Amino acid sequence: DMSLSPNGTQLITSYMYLDQGIIKCKIVFYNFGLGKNDPRRVVGIFFPQDLGDAMAGRVRFLDESHAVIFTDKGMQLFSTRVETSPESVKQIPIEENIRSITYAQEYVGLVTDNVEGGDPYSLKIFDKEGNTVFDRTFNYQYTGFDIDGGLVLLYNDSSCKVYNMTGTEKYNGTFDF
């Protein structure tokens, strides 16, 4: 996967490769806005030991100075404020099976299996620094999951649930077609 920063000067990529018959992952940060000191424009490389041997299936710039990597073992947030040296800000391990991910400029969200209690799913929202905004369980058969402004949307073909950033359900309704 790859993601271009909003101003188009930075690129983050996730590469999968084989090493002695074992599939591994590396994350590479490029900056095309800097001088030609490094003709490859590589400003940072993170190997599997930095990511706990996780496979990074999705990488995204949230804004000019924040990026997120979604792995099969959780997510990791990076700061690119120092253009020549991206740094890991926070690694958030997730033990449960990750069902869905979403991201916006200010927030990152995950839906996971809920292993405690009666509801089958857990909704976890984080800010771009990796702080938990809210974490709640739910029982709703969704097909889509988005963050729009200060709202979290879960929806399917015939209904929708909307939560605010305190985790309060603001809307729960069906559509008549």
Segments predicted by a language model, with ranges:
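Surface-exposed loop/turn elements that mediate protein-protein interactions on large endomembrane-trafficking
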Residues: 1, 25-50, 72-94, 117-138, ...
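Repeated scaffold domains used in trafficking and secretory/extracellular systems
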Residues: 1-6, 44-64, 92-106, 138-150, ...
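A generic structural signal for ordered secondary structure
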Residues: 5-6, 10-12, 125-127
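Short beta-strand elements that form the blades of beta-propeller/WD-repeat-like
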Residues: 8-21, 58-71, 75-77, 102-117, ...
